[in-house]
């Protein structure tokens, strides 16, 4: 409330202990979301590492491998994977436009960030790490529109039983059935990647190589 009184319009909550923990944490998270809605504040997080925007000279995250400016936007439910993507950006010199560690994504969801990236003139491709979905149908309907304007490269976590348990404890998100998710991704035009390194390489290609202007291209390897 004090922040809102000062004129703050958006807040990133890095603190954990919400839906990523227990029932009491879930209740606290719902109260946080309700307060943000009451005050008309954009809320990102909680339980995220922060945001980075090299084009605005902004690096506001807990772990901060500051990446060079580029055309790749990053959004992830895992802060560690954001750090990995930014480290690859530093190693390769292929930079990023924006980066968000969404955490529990209690109010502003992964799909909301992807929609904004699709309107961002500084972004040519979005790189996404996703552990689970609660609104699968909504995600599908919105992302298939986004991919018509912006390539999306996605790494899906929580595909094993151990990974599903880790996803639930890490971000408070339920991992989706892998076969269902694969079908959805294929229909929506998402480019799937098996791991972080491959995902960055694919995104780097989208960001640095122009797409063919027509279907008359033959590739020999």
Spans of features found by a protein language model:
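Catalytic-core regions of core metabolic enzymes
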Residues: 1-221
């Amino acid at each position: 409330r004090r922040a809102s009184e000062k004129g703050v319009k958006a807040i990133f909550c890095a603190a954990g202990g919400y839906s990523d923990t227990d029932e009491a944490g879930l209740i606290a998270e719902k109260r946080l979301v309700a307060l943000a809605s009451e005050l008309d504040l954009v809320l990102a997080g909680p339980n995220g590492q922060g945001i980075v925007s090299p084009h605005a000279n902004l690096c506001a995250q807990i772990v901060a491998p500051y990446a060079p400016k580029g055309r790749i936007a990053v959004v992830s439910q895992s802060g560690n994977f954001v750090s990995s993507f930014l480290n690859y950006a530093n190693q390769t010199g292929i930079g990023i436009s924006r980066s968000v560690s969404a955490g529990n994504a209690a109010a502003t969801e992964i799909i909301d960030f992807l929609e904004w990236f699709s309107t961002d003139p500084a972004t040519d491709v979005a790189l996404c790490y996703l552990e689970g979905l609660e609104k699968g149908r909504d995600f599908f309907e919105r992302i298939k529109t986004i991919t018509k304007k912006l390539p999306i490269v996605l790494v899906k976590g929580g595909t094993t039983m151990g990974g599903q348990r880790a996803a639930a404890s890490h971000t408070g998100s339920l991992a989706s059935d892998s076969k269902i998710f694969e079908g959805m991704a294929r229909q929506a035009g998402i480019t799937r990647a098996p791991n972080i390194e491959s995902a960055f390489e694919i995104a780097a290609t989208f960001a640095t190589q122009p797409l063919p202007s027509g279907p008359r291209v033959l590739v020999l390897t």
